[in-house]
Design a protein with these regions (language model features):
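Nucleotide-state sensing region of NTPase/ATPase domains
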Residues: 33-128, 132-140, 144, 206, ...
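Single conserved hydrophobic/aromatic residue that forms the stacking wall/gate
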Residues: 1-13
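Phosphate-binding glycine-rich loops of NTP-binding sites
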Residues: 10, 14-45, 276-291
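An accessory alpha-helical subdomain
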Residues: 114-217, 228-231
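Conserved ABC ATPase signature
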Residues: 17-20, 234-287, 312
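C-terminal lobe/lid and adjacent interdomain/linker elements of RecA-like ASCE P-loop ATPase modules
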Residues: 64, 81, 317-359
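Walker B catalytic acidic pair
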Residues: 308-310
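Loop/turn-to-beta-strand initiation segments
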Residues: 110, 301-303, 327-332
Length: 359
């Protein structure tokens, strides 16, 4: 048990060297959301080398808990097993209930994480920006994860069907087209739901993010967020039918929400092409602060902020902006830089060899 009880406050964690366990702590807190590690990689990489599994135990207290007394926390036990263990993967038990897949925690512990790797949101591939939207939606609307998984399952089946099979193993054409029609029907239903949720969320997120950017840049540029859709609402089924022969020739799916993008613009120009390093940081910081504010507006509850070594990536102006916004909600922030915490009112801890101690 290395963490004190912190409610509605800032917790700053520092060390003089990398590799002492700061990020591991934030990663452990993030896993309570039901999401995968924000650093990527496989679940098995969360387990200490040579061990069959890892265990995380925590108590969380939400601002609104309808089924419990106001001061009664949720006791969460999360296990991560390697492929060779008795229970591979991530499983979670809440208040002594039977373990279930950790993804079932979605929505029970709201959090927003920001680490230097998120700068790729601007100049990286569209997949990263789609994941940004989908991860936020999974926390806000637990049912979204079910829809998203159904879509991915149908998409995987469709791509397997479209792939050219070895000679002599190809399905009869009529059978292939019949299966394709069934899968396209499922993709149209789930894909429409995915796009509808993304569009609605973006309507809330965009004004917040753009206002944040204007404040950060002192009005130097105007930021815009635009959903780059392949189809209008209600039009996915027709699009899938129209491009069916093209997909058969290509051997893969070519349309749907998995091919769409979130465009980030500065003064009408694509940020992925023209944004400087400083502008990229401002865009991502604006998005992450907007993600937290949108979650608070939708749920009535501020998510926990997890900021992993991002202060050192920011200039003084952006750093002061972030430190000011940190005061609005519970925040865990890590840094190797002592000066990063000079202007914070939060409690400061040192992490050394995985051991946390108050300074």
């Amino acid at each position: 048990e290395i963490m004190p009880s912190l409610v509605g406050s800032e917790m700053c964690i520092r060390d003089s060297n990398n590799g002492q366990g700061k990020t591991n702590l934030l990663e452990a807190i993030w896993l309570l959301t039901g999401g995968k590690s924000f650093r990527g990689g496989k679940d098995a990489e969360l387990v200490r080398r040579g061990e069959p599994f890892a265990v995380l135990e925590a108590s969380t207290l939400r601002a609104q808990q309808e089924e419990q007394e106001p001061d009664e926390p949720n006791r969460v036990r999360l296990t991560v097993g390697t492929p060779d263990s008795q229970r591979p993967g991530r499983y979670a038990s809440v208040n002594g209930a039977a373990p279930r897949r950790a993804a079932g925690l979605a929505g029970s512990f709201p959090a927003v994480v920001f680490d230097p790797g998120h700068l790729s949101l601007v100049k990286g591939a569209p997949e990263g920006r789609r994941k940004f939207l989908d991860a936020a939606l999974c926390q806000l609307y637990p049912g979204y994860l079910t829809v998203y998984r159904r879509y991915l399952r149908a998409l995987q089946q469709k791509n397997a069907l479209l792939r050219r099979s070895p000679a002599g193993q190809e399905r009869p054409y009529a059978e292939k087209m019949a299966l394709l029609e069934v899968l396209n029907t499922e993709l149209a239903a789930q894909g429409e739901a995915i796009q509808q949720r993304r569009r609605a969320y973006l309507e809330r997120l965009a004004p917040l993010a753009c206002a944040n950017y204007e404040e950060l840049s002192h009005g130097a540029e105007r930021m815009e967020l635009r959903y780059a859709a392949q189809f209008e609402p209600g039009g996915l089924a027709a699009l899938l039918k129209a491009r069916q022969n093209e997909e058969v020739r290509a051997g893969q799916s070519l349309c749907g929400p998995h091919r769409e993008d979130l465009e980030l613009l500065l003064d009408g120009q694509p940020a992925r092409v023209f944004a400087s390093q400083g502008q990229q940081r401002s865009v991502v910081l604006s998005l992450k602060m907007a993600e937290a504010a949108a979650a608070a507006a939708i749920t009535g509850e501020h998510p926990v902020l997890l900021l992993d070594d991002v202060l050192s990536e920011l200039d003084d102006g952006r750093k002061q902006y972030l430190l000011t916004r940190m005061r609005e909600k519970q925040t865990f922030v890590t840094s190797c830089d002592d000066t990063a915490f000079l202007k914070t009112d939060g409690e400061v801890y040192r992490m050394n060899g995985g051991v946390l101690s108050k300074i």
